[in-house]
Amino acid sequence: MAASVPWFTERYTPHDVRSHQLKKVLVRSQTRFQKAVLADTYSFGRCLILNDEIQSAEKDEFIYHECLVQPAMALHPRPRDILILGGGEGATVREILRHPRVRRVTMVDIDGDRKSVV
């Protein structure tokens, strides 16, 4: 592997890591709460990396967010006004807004600066 090729290595345990070759780093930022990197990868598409851990990947984030949101939305008789605690990347909001009965979504995240990265 060429030394000039950018790689991101994520540590899963003290004994296990996974490395991802980056196509391009789009944004690097440091907020009061976290270090954020938005990068395009070859295997997972665009990734949001927070504090050196992949938070979300374009290729498979829908699996997590659909499973998080859709059961609650299906079970609630009239989901209209929704409060999301966290969810700064916006995928939870996207899933909620698929439901026509929703009239208002409020999202509160500890790190308001992260929206400018995502």
Predicted ranges, named:
Residues 1-47:
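N-terminal auxiliary segments of SAM/dcSAM-dependent transferases
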Residues 2-8, 56-118:
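The AdoMet/dcAdoMet-binding core of the Class I SAM-like
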